[in-house]
Amino acid sequence: MFGIIVGTHGRFSEELLKSCEMICGEQKNVKAVTLIPGEGPDDVVKKYEAAIQELQENGCDGNVLFLNDLFGGSPYNAACRLVISNESYGIVTGVSMPMLIEIISAQMADDGSDIKDVMAKAVEAGRNGAQTFHASSVADEEEDEL
């Protein structure tokens, strides 16, 4: 089973994980890593390494998906430092609740997907999770029904 590390600016990762756990239940193989004011990429790398150790102790197979908030941000840059030397790691940016729920579901299914397949699922879930609604949409639907 692959591990998931959600790395973000501030406490967003912790709260996002808590919100997803309301739907998916407690997740032992998902770790939240924060970048708080005063910390830099070196601090985040250390937190990532500790999270990876915990994931391995929980039985993860060595594949790790980093879900970061911003491309080019410090949590992303810190993850890059680890991913560059390990082909079983990957990063997807733009983490959202629909994305994390989809990836937790894929993790629970444990279908043997490699990290690149999981990354593609994450990107698709992120795209599909962004939807729109406006009052004119309802009016247009009502007109179509007449």
What is each stretch, according to the model?
Residues F2-L146:
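N-terminal loops that bind phosphate or other acidic moieties
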